[in-house]
Swiss-Prot record:
It is found in: Virion. Coiled coil: none annotated. Its main location: virion. This is Capsid protein.
Length: 770
């Protein structure tokens, strides 16, 4: 047949190229050949009587050379079993307008109604996480690890399934340490990740039709990892790899087609709030003075929010003293536009700046819609609603402050709403315009301050989570989740506020005379007195404490993140990136052989309703050599006394069903500097403080003499004895851990410390599962 000829024919569209083994010039100098001596001629006679010359073949003798490397072999356990852990997970789920959030942090949320997830993720995978996914029925194991306390990791195959309409970009990281920094989330922005040569594009079926519906990636073991047999407890929390993924838009990379501009607009508080931003009760006098200055400025009431916040209060008859003439119409300015009489107002927050307004009611010609009596309503309404909230909530509501009330406080929609009766008469805010394609990042600063901080300046000690010299559209990506992990406060969105400094906005968000000055942005919905997303259902407790926080500033970060290049614009209600994984493991050990004896008299049928046997999977956390019987523990049909004693000393596990973890296991940890660690140490309770102290053998007696003498004077004898006992116990635990590490090194079971998670020492000391 001619099939072989057709198959061997060279294709015409492939250009000719030189094969690497047929190069004209060799890339490496060869070793000189050994010179051979002259061969000796040997003649022999053939059968036909004719002679033919024959050459004797000399055996080539090579030169003995030493081996450049030696192979270190490790004896394998008697029993080995290959296991593939196969499962399916959503790498990320992005709800509407959640592009700037980290899905790994919100993967276990139960908030409803509202959008779910986030547009980027920082996932990590460990053996513990794989077992947790098995308990959630999200994967299956092809072999059991019961009674097999050793393991080897061989890598993983990842399969990413393409979405019909949305593109994604992923990056696989196997280089330790697997920790998040302030640059991790900005580097995952699609505008940044598109410039990374190690990033992989996952195009949608619409962007690249006609190709496979999945993309396969082979990932080896992490760097700095030695392939050998380990106890499963040692590899339980070792990070195998991290997956960085983000949504992207390849069809419209520079702005959504549903908008007519790429410019982002938001509002920031004016400078009158600089020294009055704190919510502490001790600062109430300053807030009261600012509140009086704002309420006396009548042009601020030229907005429809005045009717929404104060008219129901007046119509309900809550204005004191009550009179028949106290109606909403009594607060409206009735002066017609027939006079040019003017009124001068002092702008709040200053003593020298004055504004001249007409006394008429035409707001388009700098008139005031309401008369001067309206200035008394915000305070009365705020005090009335604050007392009502105190009565309803009782002891759970501790602080009653009318300056922070929803209807008439400092941050009421009357002052902060962007919609004014006349656009040239703004409120107590400044409109900011931002073009992402002019941002070079130089001089940009993004940080958070606690709500108790008394000013808007950046402080190296009080301010947290600084991101500088990056474009705002990149710095806003995953910022709130990074702050929650960095500070350890899972309620950070209600306890801190965002501040921005940038010279690339219009007007510039900076003060040349004060380089550390920041500005507090807020969303359009917060200015209109609404919840994020536009809902008017504000909880009663939040109405009593209405002020800008990260919860109300998230929409500003969302708008900044979506303005960057290749950013996803939330055109679909919900999108997800699915992934299949196949982790390859080898379980090993020397288990005791179990003999199963069945009843021979019981009738069994090979056919019928047969149910497949399920595998018995053991938690790798407790699958340690100390908790497993081995062949050397079994002598003469019985277990030895040492094995029984070893098993009795181990703690037993109790099945306690908790409400769930505060943070998902798949979320990566964050890197803490030494300065942040010292600040956090001051907030820890006494046993942990003692645990973090320097051991006695590393501390000199001269340095301790001064501090101990002062402490001993104030403490009683019993307190000193309790503290010394606590120190001795912690010292004993540390010594036992030290001996355990030395023993692992001697057994060749040590793991590179960069592969282990942070905080493992504390968790092991107190025997708490991280």
């Amino acid at each position: 047949m001619a099939y072989g000829w057709w198959r061997r024919r060279r294709r015409r569209w492939r250009r000719w190229r030189r094969r690497p083994w047929r190069r004209r010039w060799r890339t490496r100098r060869r070793r000189p050949a050994r010179r051979r001596g002259r061969r000796r001629n040997v003649r022999r006679r053939r059968r036909g009587g004719r002679w033919r010359r024959r050459y004797r073949r000399w055996k080539r003798k090579g030169r003995r050379r030493k081996k450049a490397k030696i192979i270190i072999r490790q004896w394998q356990p008697n029993y080995r079993r290959r296991c593939n852990i196969v499962g399916y997970i959503p790498v990320l789920i992005c709800g509407e307008n959640t592009v700037s959030r980290n899905y790994a942090t919100h993967s276990d949320d139960t908030n409803y109604p509202g959008p779910f997830g986030g547009g980027m993720t920082t996932d990590k995978f460990t053996l513990r996480i794989l077992y947790d996914e098995y308990k959630r029925f999200m994967n299956y194991w092809t072999a059991s690890n019961e009674d097999l306390d050793l393991c080897r990791y061989l890598g993983v195959n990842l399969y990413f399934f393409r979405h019909p309409d949305v593109d994604f970009i992923i990056k696989i990281n196997t280089m330790p340490p697997f920790l998040d920094t302030e640059l991790t989330a900005p580097s995952i922005h699609p505008g940044m990740l598109a410039l990374d040569k190690r990033a992989r594009w996952i195009p949608s079926l619409k962007s690249r039709p006609g190709k496979k519906h999945y993309i396969k990636i082979r990932v080896e073991a992490p760097k700095m990892f030695t392939d050998k047999w380990y106890p499963q407890t040692d590899l339980c929390d070792m990070v195998l790899l991290t997956v960085y993924a983000t949504t992207a838009d390849m069809q419209y990379p520079f702005g959504s087609p549903l908008t007519d501009s790429v410019v982002v607009n938001f509002q920031v508080l004016q400078s009158m709030y600089d020294q009055n931003i704190s919510i502490l009760p001790t600062e109430k006098s300053k807030r009261t003075q600012l509140h009086d200055n704002i309420t006396r400025y009548t042009p601020f009431y030229n907005t429809t929010q005045t009717i929404a916040q104060l008219k129901p209060f007046v119509d309900a008859g809550n204005v004191t003293p009550v009179s028949p003439t106290t109606t909403w119409g009594s607060y409206i300015n009735t002066t017609k536009f027939t006079t040019t009489a003017t009124t001068t107002y002092t702008y709040p927050g200053t003593t020298t700046t004055t504004v001249t307004m007409l006394t008429c009611n035409d707001s388009w010609y700098r008139g005031t819609v309401y008369n001067n009596q309206i200035s008394q309503l915000p305070k009365k309404a705020a005090e009335f609603y604050s007392k009502a909230t105190k009565t309803l909530l009782g002891d759970t509501f501790t602080t009653e402050d009318y300056t922070l009330e929803y209807h008439g406080g400092l941050y009421s929609s009357i002052w902060l709403s962007a919609g004014r009766s006349y656009f040239e008469t703004p409120g107590v805010y400044t409109d900011i315009k931002y073009n992402p394609f002019t941002d070079r990042g130089e001089g940009n600063m993004l940080w958070i301050d606690w709500l108790s901080k008394k000013n808007m300046n950046y402080d190296k000690v009080q301010s947290k989570c600084l991101i500088s010299d990056l474009p705002l559209w990149a710095a806003a990506y995953g910022y709130v989740e990074f702050c929650a992990k960095s500070t350890g406060d899972q309620n950070i969105h209600m306890n801190a506020k965002l501040l921005i400094r940038s010279p690339f906005t219009d007007p510039q968000l900076l003060v040349h005379t004060d380089p550390t000055k920041g500005f507090v942005p807020y969303s359009l919905n917060f200015g209109n007195g609404k919840m994020p997303g536009g809902s008017s259902n504000v909880p009663i407790r939040m109405r009593a404490k209405w002020y800008p926080t990260l919860f109300h500033q998230q929409e500003v970060l969302e708008a900044l993140a979506q303005s960057g290049p290749f950013a996803y614009h939330s055109d679909i209600k919900k999108v997800s990136l699915g992934m299949k994984y196949r982790f390859k493991w080898i379980w090993g050990g020397n288990p005791v052989r179990q003999q199963v004896v069945r009843n021979p008299c019981k009738e069994t049928h090979s056919s019928g309703n047969r149910v497949p046997r399920s595998l018995q999977i053991v938690d790798p956390k407790y699958n340690s050599p100390e908790l497993t019987f081995h062949t050397w523990d079994f002598r003469r049909g019985l277990f030895g006394p040492k094995a029984i004693q070893r098993m009795q000393q181990q703690p037993t596990t109790t099945d306690i069903f908790s409400a769930g973890r505060k943070r998902p296991r798949r979320d990566t940890e964050v890197y803490h500097s030494s300065q942040e660690g010292e600040q956090k140490e001051s907030l820890l309770f006494l046993p942990v403080k003692l645990l973090r102290r320097v051991p006695p053998w590393e501390d000199s007696q001269q340095e301790e003499s001064g501090s101990q003498s002062s402490e001993e004077e104030t403490q009683t004898v019993s307190q000193q004895l309790k503290q010394q006992l606590q120190q001795q116990r912690i010292l004993g635990v540390k010594l036992r851990l030290l001996f355990n590490q030395v023993q692992k090194i001697q057994q060749n079971q040590d793991i590179n410390p960069t592969l282990l998670p942070r905080g493992g020492d504390l968790a092991s000391l107190f025997q708490i599962a991280p």
